[in-house]
């Protein structure tokens, strides 16, 4: 049942969210740079008018947005008190990019076995800023909260593990860091077509400059916890498909591993995952709306990625087939290391083999869904993604 509109409006008033964040931080007022306020205004209006939030969903969304605003305030306060954070050089991440369900998580976590990579665990992306009652050296409160949230999500939506292997302590996507810009894919969580249309026209440079700022802050915290310095960051999120050109401009020595799989095997599964997330915030989200929006969004993302690929030096990219990642993950890892110019010795290869023995895809249940439920047909998917299939699936061989 949808929450009363007046309740949603009071919960998600943008000015009220900002004021609450200031109050929770004891009067901090510097939210940092970027168009976060305009983005927040558009996002909140769309959530209020279009998302059909339940009472629980509206309350959860309020906490999500206030928490992100609080993080912005705390992050800026740390940069003010420790200006050396801004001097941390992060310009050469190894970035795994592809549609969801193309083996990106498996590949990221396999490579993350190597301590030469800095990665962001789920708890770090969910709670990037210290909370009351903990120290930089011992982030126990954040870890406990993140573990409790993951456990709650699994209890409420057990099928989520068939879609994405959630674990608060393992490497995950930096998407939750990017969300702090408020220029992000809110349609991952709710039906916000007006916001999504606005987002399609935005310059995403501020998203990536803020992502770099967040990574600098996380790396600085890792040093405070005694984590050994790494060679480079390992990043991964499908959202980078929309902005490979911006990514490579903000991180000028980034190298990109592009993962490939037939969109007919990925887009419907992704719509199913999005529908699962929408159910956390709305009682009866329309699966057809989910399917239409994600099909259109991923078609735009793939088109943008193909255009960026044409404009950027070919040597910045490595193509990897999903089938190879599943059937020969260590062979794919070796190819990635060669591409990255990093040696892979026997000790590290053995560590990866041990990790695969414990965490292969065969350890997870299959994701069961109907493509028709989300309005897809095989013919439509073949038509909408014909250019990608003709070009990149063959090129990845």
Please tell me what each predicted stretch does.
Residues 85-91:
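Phosphate-binding P-loop
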Residues 113-123:
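Post-Walker A helix-loop "phosphate-sensing" segment adjacent to the P-loop in P-loop NTPases
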Residues 97-99, 234-238, 322:
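Short His-Asn-centered micro-motif
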Residues 229-253:
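Flexible, glycine/threonine-enriched loop-and-boundary segments that flank and lead into catalytic domains
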Residues 247-272:
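Conserved phosphate-donor/acceptor-positioning beta-strand/loop module used by diverse small-molecule
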Residues 1-77, 85, 191-208, 215, ...:
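PAPS-dependent sulfotransferases, especially Golgi type II membrane carbohydrate sulfotransferases
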Residues 126-233:
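PAPS-dependent sulfation machinery
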Residues 96-113:
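Glycine-rich phosphate-binding P-loop
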